[in-house]
A protein has these predicted regions:
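A binding-site-centric feature that preferentially detects glycan-recognition modules on secreted/surface proteins
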Residues: 1-78, 82-149
Length: 149
């Protein structure tokens, strides 16, 4: 079930959260720009805190494999944003000293950049990577995390 609560407080922007991760472990992102300047998410805490529920899993949802961000949007499936995924990483790391998505990749289909590409997060080697996929990309490793608002 959906038993992992993620609370997004005001001020928790993509770059703020990425910086918090960078203070705890190695990180990499696809751009030198501030993530706050390039990320557009379905939900933000700009108007106040909110909460979502995710499945409590290390790897992104098996149920979401081979489904592109565009298909997710067409089917109106609610999935985590980049902010929510990074918050989950921080929470999981503080609880376990381990990382999420060590074998798979979370497609953050609740977020886009200005040109419409979709962020993803994974643990690769010794770093948390924030990368990008085209909205039509789909494969077995790339999976969104379904969310309940």
């Amino acid at each position: 079930g959906f038993d992992r609560l993620i609370i997004v407080a005001p001020g928790m922007t993509p770059q703020v959260l990425f910086n918090k991760c960078s203070g705890l472990f190695k990180t990499w992102k696809y751009t030198n720009k501030d993530l706050d300047e390039v990320i557009i998410s379905d939900r933000t805490p700009a108007k106040g805190a909110y909460a979502i529920w995710l499945r409590d899993r290390i790897e992104a949802d098996e149920e979401m494999k081979n489904i592109s961000a565009n298909q997710i949007k067409q089917q109106q499936i609610i999935t985590c944003t980049l902010e929510e995924r990074i918050l989950y990483e921080l929470k999981y790391f503080k609880e376990t000293n381990q990382h999420l998505d060590v074998q798979k990749i979370t497609l953050c289909a609740g977020s886009r950049n200005q040109s419409g590409v979709v962020p993803n997060v994974r643990w690769y080697g010794s770093k948390m990577f924030v990368g990008w996929y085209n909205p039509d990309d789909q494969d077995d490793l790339l999976r969104a995390r379904a969310a309940v608002i």
